């Protein structure tokens, strides 16, 4: 068991504890809230996006929720794959 915060999870503490246990890679498939918290804490080292050729309506949220982030040095496209019109993009920080 990892305790990483009193009430809310301190993501930096949690990831540090995982690293101490030998888990150097963590895949976070969270929603906008978790993604926003990771980005705000500077804990993202890769961003994978999928673009679909299908249109859907509704009230979809952005991929990051929370306060606005200051633009940093940006991200660079690391790889791009296409299959059946879907684009799979992998970005890494500059």
What do the predicted segments below correspond to?
Residues 1-94:
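Enzymes that bind and transform nitrogen-containing heteroaromatic metabolites
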